[in-house]
Amino acid sequence: MEYAHIMPEDIFKNPEVKVYVEAGNSCLGALGFTEHGRPHAKRCSNYARNILEALDYDTRTCELAAIAGYLHDIGNTVNRVDHAHSGAIMAFTLLTRMNMPPEEIAIICSAIGHHDEKTAFPVNAVSAAL
């Protein structure tokens, strides 16, 4: 099966992603949290990519970190509680629909699912950077 080579820019400009990022930001705003919209998503994307680049990881791993960084808070659309887990499931659905290779989806979803401040654990390089 032929899979798509999804780049961070594909995620940044995806209209569905924009809706989820902004919906999560709206939910958090109602709960009294600071900004968690596209500026936050882009900062996290850049930080995750830059960390792995500084550690000399390969280009694709750095790109996957950028994607995970951008998507990491979309689960706030569902609820702040367990947002890492719901976000990983949302990312799985989105990236599968975009035809990303399962091996890459697994890395991204693991990173998102393990990023919560209470249950975080660095299960791979991308999750450590995130």
Where do the PLM segments sit?
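Alpha-helix N-cap/helix-start motif at coil-to-helix transitions, marked by capping-box chemistry
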Residues: 11-18, 35-42, 59, 85, ...
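Active-site flanking loop/helix segments enriched in acidic
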Residues: 18-53, 70-77
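Histidine (H) residue identity feature
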Residues: 3-5, 36, 40, 83-85, ...
